[in-house]
Amino acid sequence: MCAMILKNPDKNSEFANFFTKMTACFGDFSLFEQQINEIATVAGIDLSQFMIDHLAVRMNSVEKAEQWRIMLLVQSELLKESEVNGRPIGLFTLLQPLNFLNQQVDVIELPFPKGKTYPQEGWEHIEIVVPFLADETIEQWIARLIKQFQLDQNERLKVKISQPKVEGERLANPSIAISLKDETNQNNCCLKFHPYDIKLIVRSES
């Protein structure tokens, strides 16, 4: 069982117990930090300069997804649950934020599985916010980030661009995902860029 002590322990013993259960399900939190930091270092990204708006997990069975959903709701509120590409994806706002790489992050994304088998279940990626410039199109935003971080020239990175469309969302939410090509080090995590804080995207729907 994977567990760790809360980085910012307080008198909320219920949340501390929840955190222990969460890391037992999702995996070693400090290892997740190390893996994300490794990707950022390879890509030349200073994460302290960007907002980390949410963390995400992955699993290989609907049964596990349902168990994790129940577990999260013990110490979080459901921010939103949407159908994306034929599967439900839930966003949960924790009652107490997690300290992730010196940032306070309180949203966890939990998507139900859809056929793909992940080599490792649990913590999978983070998303950082890189806002659009004035009058910038999606294509220009993508091109700017690829050029800024030289993503197309870094032989150690895999790059995936996507534009998921969620019913009701009014703000465009393209993403650029980067991960390490060399998986011999067991780093199966991913770092994603997108232009809006996920909470702003949700608020824009109402």
Segments and roles (model prediction):
Residues 2-53, 57-87, 92-206:
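Glyoxalase I/VOC metalloenzyme domain signal
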